[in-house]
Amino acid sequence: PRNYCFHFTCMGTVKHHYAMIGTAHLEDGYPLYYDAVNEKGLGMAGLNFVGNAHYQKEEEGKENVAVFELIPWILGQCGSVEEAKKLFMRMNLTDTRFRGNLPAAQLHWMISDRNQSVTIESVQEGIRIHENPVGVLTNNPPFEEQMFQLNNYMHLSPKEPTNHFSDKLKLQAYCLGMGALGMPGDLSSQSRFIRAAFVKMNSVSGDSEEESVSQFFHILGSVDQQRGCCETKDGTFETTIYTSCCNMSRGVYYYTTYENHQITAVDLYRENLNGRCLACFPLIREEMIRRQN
């Protein structure tokens, strides 16, 4: 809510700010956001950027903001991507820990409003702002590399392919979907970026909110991580813990979890936006099955 106090490491206490809604890990009563959208319709999400993220020590004359504070710092005072870009020009992103046993997460971020998206990366050279024309971001590699790889897939099409192989051969498509032959199907973040970009930019949604929300989850379903298919070095499995989107005009936040495919909605405006206490809702993690008989 607007009057929840954010105690920033170097920037003091902010008692009044834009209200926001999102998914967070609550640590000692403080929301460590994975993603969020504010009441002005500005959204932000952080994704893994291990090995490439680089943060600075505190610097005099800059607005020093710790990584774990970044989402509320931006969404608390910015109503658009353009406002956020100006704020980043004054900012120094630090590696200050929330607590001793919680190291700074290595992330890069996508920030979006109704009109545009940008990717923010803090690297050795400093903070970099990239225009994001596809409105998609995954984990590593750096965003410029992700975008460059799209050049290798400019032949992909939702349409039925025609024969460019040779006019001496009578070649023809023998099933639907062959226009997308060659689209990577593996679970690497680079391949998921390509797949998500293609599906997002070619998908067709109905006009209603329900149809748009449904289509969003179908789009993200194309890059779902299934348990058992991506094993980490310590023997655990990478999975899609949750998937979310938000109607930026109405402040309705929708999500599913790995365990529950039913879409759950949380409405920002059904809470007291002028309150001082967090409104917390646990993620639903058991499958909700609608039985018809």
Write out the residue ranges for each language-model feature:
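A contiguous strand-loop segment
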Residues: P1-E63, R90-M91, D95, P282-I284, ...
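Short, surface-exposed charged micro-motifs
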Residues: Y33-D35, H108, T119, T243-C245
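C-terminus-biased signal that marks the final domain/tail of proteins
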Residues: L87, T96-R99, A104-A105, D113-Q116, ...
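Acidic/His-rich structured neighborhood in mature extracellular/periplasmic domains
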Residues: L47, K57-V67, M91-E144, F148-Q149
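Short hydrophobic/aromatic-rich beta-strand segments that constitute the beta-sheet cores
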Residues: M44-G46, I129, Y253-Y255
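Proteins synthesized as precursors that undergo proteolytic processing into mature forms
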Residues: E59-R99, P103, E209-H218
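Secondary-structure transition/turn motif
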Residues: N48-F49, V123-Q124, T256-H261
